[in-house]
């Protein structure tokens, strides 16, 4: 009977993974090393800022028809407090 030898399969997997990882590393080192994370954080921060701005613009308080519900919801859910985690 034929005994299945999986060493070559493992080697193929290892080689594939290594090539992918080196490819990623080359792409990342094209910029400065931590540029990816800082760019990501900046984008997320801007997203929160713009969400807050748009929220304030669209839900202006006043004697509007829905102002009663908006105030109640803001009281109940406490507004979106951002924590710098």
Curated annotation (Swiss-Prot):
The protein depicted here goes by the name Abdominal ganglion neuropeptide R3-14
Role of this protein: HRBP is a myoactive peptide that excites Aplysia heart and enhances gut motility in vitro.
> GO cellular-component terms in the record?
extracellular region
Task: Specify the species.
Answer: Aplysia fasciata (Mottled sea hare)
On tissue specificity, the annotation reads: Neurons R3-R14. A cluster of 12 giant neurons located on the right side of the abdominal ganglion.
Q: Which domain of life does this protein belong to?
A: Eukaryota
> What biological processes does GO assign it?
neuropeptide signaling pathway
Q: Please give the residue positions where the record annotates the modification Pyrrolidone carboxylic acid.
A: 43
> Where found in the cell?
Secreted
Q: What is its main location?
A: secreted
Give UniProt keywords alphabetically.
Cleavage on pair of basic residues, Neuropeptide, Pyrrolidone carboxylic acid, Secreted
């Amino acid at each position: 009977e034929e005994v299945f030898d999986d060493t070559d399969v493992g080697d193929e997997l290892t080689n594939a993974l290594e090539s992918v990882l080196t490819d990623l590393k080359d792409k990342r080192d094209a910029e400065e090393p931590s540029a990816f994370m800082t760019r990501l954080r900046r984008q997320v921060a801007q997203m929160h800022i713009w969400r807050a701005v748009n929220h304030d613009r669209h839900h202006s308080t006043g004697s509007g028809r829905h102002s009663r519900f908006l105030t109640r919801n803001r009281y109940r859910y406490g507004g979106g407090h951002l924590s710098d985690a």
